[in-house]
Design a protein with these regions (language model features):
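Glycine-/small-residue-enriched capping loops at alpha/beta junctions
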Residues: 2-3, 17-203
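Intrinsic disorder/low-complexity signal
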Residues: 10-11, 27
Length: 203
């Protein structure tokens, strides 16, 4: 399995046979943030991301998602096909729970990218989405991340009403230990549904 230069499989990833880099990526976790993280909504566009810097950009994709779509596809284009090349070379498969950390240099306003596998689309459910989000929060804490940008972990692709499960995801992200700001990149309709759910269910 060829390893992409500068990238690594985070320890604890569930992808069988993945190379594990233990210790090298971890930093001392910062002190727990006592309040809820600030929440910001942005459009899933590169120019908007450029104007909304954060410590970490979280991208996610299904193992059978070809080609990469949405924000992951846009970022892949900005990175000259780096994410696609991982898949072609077998470095990253998108298996459920897989996490790849990648330094972006100056190509994005986010110095580090965390690419997360969601497994097969047909097997994906809202409880899996929330589980992946919890893993991301834990990884961010271990890396000392204060601000992050993420999508909705493909909740908008599920049959479950987004206005019901979306607020649970937002609450989980905002409650993450050490996080001071969470930026969610989502289209207008998904943003409206989640916001309506937050208002109705009080999350």
């Amino acid at each position: 399995m060829a390893r992409s230069p500068g990238s690594a499989i985070l320890a604890g990833a569930r992808s069988p046979g993945s190379a594990i880099l233990a210790g090298a990526l971890a930093t001392e976790p910062g002190p727990a943030y006592s309040g809820r993280a600030e929440l910001k909504w942005v459009a899933p566009e590169l120019r908007v991301l450029d104007d909304s810097p954060a410590d970490l950009l979280v991208l996610h994709a299904f193992s059978d998602e070809r080609p990469l779509s949405g924000l992951a596809g846009l970022v892949d284009w900005r990175l000259a096909g780096a994410l696609s090349s991982w898949r072609i070379g077998g470095f990253s498969t998108g298996a459920f729970g897989e996490r790849v950390l990648y330094p972006t240099g100056r190509r994005l306003s986010h110095p580090r990218l965390l690419f997360v596998g969601l497994g097969r689309r047909a097997e994906y459910r809202s409880d899996r989405a929330l589980g992946v989000a919890a893993d991301v929060i834990e990884a961010a804490r271990g890396l000392g991340i204060r601000t992050l940008t993420t999508g909705l972990f493909h909740l908008e692709a599920l049959a479950s009403p987004l206005e019901r499960v979306g607020p649970k995801l937002v609450h989980m992200l905002r409650s993450g230990s050490g996080l001071e700001r969470v930026t969610i990149a989502a289209d207008e309709e998904a943003t409206r549904l989640v916001k309506d759910g937050i208002q109705f269910f009080g999350r």
